[in-house]
């Protein structure tokens, strides 16, 4: 078991070597334990309101992937662009929050996440509506099953983010900016320079309901930036070349799980919803969270529903 002091030392050394720029630290092998005071406080925090709303995404086709003639930031993993049909489903309107995940942790009697005790404290009230982070794909999958949901497929995630028309960002084709998304926050400044490990363990993320002006055509929040999000698929850079035209679910096997959306640490190209990447299922990062999806029985209502 590695202790917090060792991790903090590694972080500080890394930051000095990188000249004050924040890079992510995988904390998959870090184990924390509840203090009696911390668990008591968590039992109170878990009573606070949570964002549990889901959004219906209607059955139908959407434009998946990118066309470099239109999007000059497109990566190889986004080609070719084409129409794909996806059955109706529901997806969380917001990223899973710390208080939602706390309910799961307490119900399963699991250890707290590393950032829940940052800066010598315990689960802070200011964290309640922040997206959960430092969760592996296995953690995210377990939570969704516990909540009687599932992780969205990569195609479902992309459709919920972009709508039907292949727009570059959830709000349209206008470039990403800090008025619409939380991204590009990699510099150390002010008091943070004296406590760089605090920034890595609890970075500059924002509440999941911020940026109402940047929701997707279906009203889904923060599909660009804040934290990137795990999906159910295995990741293969070349998958779009052979993916089926109906309900693609990713490769049958792999070594990495796909994540989407980019996080606070990423640059503009990486917060485009078409961008795909992957990481090992056990990876836990301070820019990586998730949201859940749910199957629905198709109906005339879901067939006829349209994005805004």
Give names to the regions the model predicted.
Residues 25-47:
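N-terminal pre-domain segments of enzymes
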Residues 42-44, 70-80, 194-195, 276-281:
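Short, P/G- and charge-enriched loop/turn segments at secondary-structure junctions
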Residues 16-28:
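Bacterial Sec-dependent signal peptides at the C-terminal "C-region" and cleavage site
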Residues 63, 67-68, 117-275, 307:
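Functional-site microenvironments in short loops/helix caps that host divalent-cation chemistry
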